[in-house]
Structure formats: structure tokens, C-alpha cells
Amino acid sequence: MQNLNNKVNNFFSNIDGLASLFFRFGIGIAFIIHGLGKFPLPPQGLIDYFNLSPALASTVAISELLTGLVLIISGFIKNSFGNILTRLSGLNITILMITILIFAHKDWFFTTKLFTSEQIFLLIGGVYFLIKGNRT
């Protein structure tokens, strides 16, 4: 069994960096899509559903779009600036997702709906990049 484990580890060690890259792209693209889905600005759906001002609703849409873009781009910046950008993206994702869960899905706490929703996995992704930065 150890021999098989070593062979599998050796195989995947050559492509280990792809795991975090796939995760980064998945979370980033999800935020880009969610942000773009709120265009044109101001996003009337957010204004009507949450009774937000046009400025705040537009800020949410732009924030989601930019966070996704920055999360992806920062993964290719291999210095402290890229690391900070990744952490800031993770922080913004975490804040956005906690806010969304509290205001839009408070009835999900703590049910199976919470743990089978896209939102919880986006939150987990945000926390991951906040903690790990570019050291993934």
C-alpha cells in the first residue's frame, strides 16, 4: 500500500500547483459571473429586493466583479504585492458572503440548505485565500 501511495504522490507532485490554480479560477470566475449578472448599473434587482440605494447596489456589483478579477490576476504576481492582493480578495469575498448569508439566506442557518449551497463554498474559498494568500 505504501508503494502505491508513493507512486500516486510522485505523479501528483508534478502538477501540485494546478490544484490551487483551479480553485483560484473557480472562485474568481464565480465572482466575475455574479458581478456581471448585476449589470447594467445600478442593478435594479438588488435595489428592489434589498431596498439598497443605487450607489450601494452598484458598489456590490463592481466589488464582486473586481474581486474575481483581482483574485485571478494576483495569483500570477509572485511577490508580496500579489500575496496582499490575494488576501484582500479573500477578505472581500468573506465579507460579501457573510453579509449575503445573513441578509439573503438567514433562514438557512444551520440547515442542510446552507451546506448544499454555492454560497457556503464561496465563503470557504474566501476564507482559504484570506488565510493562505499566494502560499497555496
Where are these regions (language model features)?
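Membrane-interface interhelical connector segments
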Residues: 3, 40-54
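Extended, low-polarity transmembrane helix blocks
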Residues: 1-37, 58-66, 70-136
